[in-house]
């Protein structure tokens, strides 16, 4: 996926598109390129199943609507076919936490805004799990003694493993998630949904605050 630090991303691209100059990309762009790869390089004509979690799950919806005659089945879990307003607002919050770092410099930083990345991780942890998750201390099943250990782990994970511009590039793609976005359906969401021919199993998440049953 573009922006993830492995494919073309703000920290891994040509100079005039690097860092804060990296273009905004949608899931339509991602799936269009994935389609070119598997059809032109690997000569694949049909896909038996597209599945994934979170943004990968969003891409499974996108595949099914963008190429309805190619995809036989999808199984997105903890994902949505269109990012909700609530989800969008949550992402604005974690983005604000990151960009408040004095080293952010509008994305033109000389060193990673580590304090902002840590803040991003700590704020995100409050959304990635539900009230019940914390009330029932389910974090102990993940190996954490208490909630502070979980918060610290999330903070350090983001500080050590993410480039800030990469992270915000993915967030922008997530916020723009809408299977009707692009030249095929021109923002007609209902038409895009009706175009899906793939057999579908939808798996919501019971333990987060933004991809529960009502959001998928």
Predicted regions and their residues:
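Gly/Pro-rich cap/lid or specificity-loop segments adjacent to the active site
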Residues: 1-58, 65, 69-82, 86-91
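Alpha/beta-hydrolase-fold enzymes
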Residues: 70-71, 75-157
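Short alpha-helical scaffolding segments that buttress acidic/His motifs in well-ordered protein cores
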Residues: 124, 128, 167-174
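Active-site nucleophile elbow and catalytic-triad environment of alpha/beta-hydrolase enzymes
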Residues: 169-192
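Short, proline-enriched alpha-helix->beta-strand connector loops that line the catalytic pocket
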Residues: 195-200
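Short beta-strand/loop motif that positions the catalytic acidic residue
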Residues: 202-204
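Acidic catalytic loop of the alpha/beta-hydrolase fold
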Residues: 207-211
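Conserved small/polar residues in nucleotide/adenosyl-binding loops
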Residues: 214-216
């Amino acid at each position: 996926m573009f922006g993830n630090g492995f494919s073309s991303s703000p920290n891994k691209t040509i100079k005039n598109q690097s860092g804060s100059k990296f273009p905004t990309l949608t899931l339509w762009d991602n799936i269009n390129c994935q389609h070119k790869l598997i059809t032109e390089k690997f000569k694949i004509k049909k896909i038996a199943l597209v599945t994934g979690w979170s943004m990968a799950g969003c891409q499974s919806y996108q595949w099914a609507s963008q190429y309805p005659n190619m995809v036989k089945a999808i199984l997105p879990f903890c994902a949505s076919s269109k990012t909700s307003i609530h989800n969008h607002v949550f992402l604005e919050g974690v983005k604000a936490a990151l960009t408040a770092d004095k080293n952010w410099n509008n994305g033109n930083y000389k060193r990673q805004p580590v304090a902002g990345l840590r803040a991003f991780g700590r704020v995100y942890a409050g959304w990635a799990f539900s009230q019940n998750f914390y009330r029932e201390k389910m974090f102990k099943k993940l190996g954490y003694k208490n909630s502070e250990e979980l918060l610290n782990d999330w903070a350090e994970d983001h500080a050590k493993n993410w480039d800030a511009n990469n992270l915000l590039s993915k967030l922008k793609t997530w916020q723009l998630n809408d299977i009707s976005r692009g030249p095929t359906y021109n923002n007609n969401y209902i038409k895009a949904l009706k175009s899906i021919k793939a057999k579908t199993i939808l798996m919501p998440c019971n333990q987060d605050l933004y991809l529960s049953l009502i959001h998928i």
